[in-house]
Curated annotation (Swiss-Prot):
GO terms for cellular component: cytosolic large ribosomal subunit. Keywords: Ribonucleoprotein, Ribosomal protein. InterPro entries: Ribosomal_bL17 (IPR000456), Ribosomal_bL17_CS (IPR047859), Ribosomal_bL17_sf (IPR036373). SUPFAM superfamilies: Prokaryotic ribosomal protein L17. Belongs to the bacterial ribosomal protein bL17 family. This is Large ribosomal subunit protein bL17. GO terms for molecular function: structural constituent of ribosome. One of its GO terms (biological process) is translation. NCBIfam families: L17. Part of the 50S ribosomal subunit. Contacts protein L32.
Length: 126
């Protein structure tokens, strides 16, 4: 039975899945918008949201916990100095998953994951 088992396996070993989600989280914090498959996007949300909540309080212990999950000093600094202060008043829901059609090769459902209060690019000057 598959009762009370949270999370998706994504057809990977646990080490591969953990590394993939870590890399995707680093990419999301770096670019603030990434495109991936829908199941990966939904799983990525479960990794990213607690990290932003952790980064709202800038302590050495929290920085070490974030570094333990991300393994990238520059991204941890960006998370604590740029990303978390933008979400200070928001009580959760820091990233948005938008459906983005289907991939050409295998018709996998695609999604865009973006941080909610990200700086808009120059293309949207309304």
């Amino acid at each position: 039975m598959h009762h009370r088992k949270s999370g998706r396996h994504l057809n990977r070993t646990s080490a591969h899945r953990k590394a993939m989600l870590r890399n995707m989280a680093v990419s999301l914090f770096q670019h603030e918008l990434i495109k991936t498959t829908l199941p990966k996007a939904k799983e990525l949300r479960r990794v990213v949201e607690p990290l932003i909540t952790l980064a709202k309080e800038d302590t050495v212990a929290n920085r070490r916990l974030a570094f333990n999950r991300l393994r990238d000093d520059a991204i941890v600094t960006k998370l604590f100095k740029e990303i978390a202060p933008r979400h200070k008043e928001r009580p959760g829901g820091y990233c948005r998953v938008l459906k983005y059609g289907f991939r050409n090769g295998d018709s996998a459902p695609m999604a865009i994951v973006e941080l909610v209060d990200r700086e808009e690019s120059e293309s949207s000057e309304d």
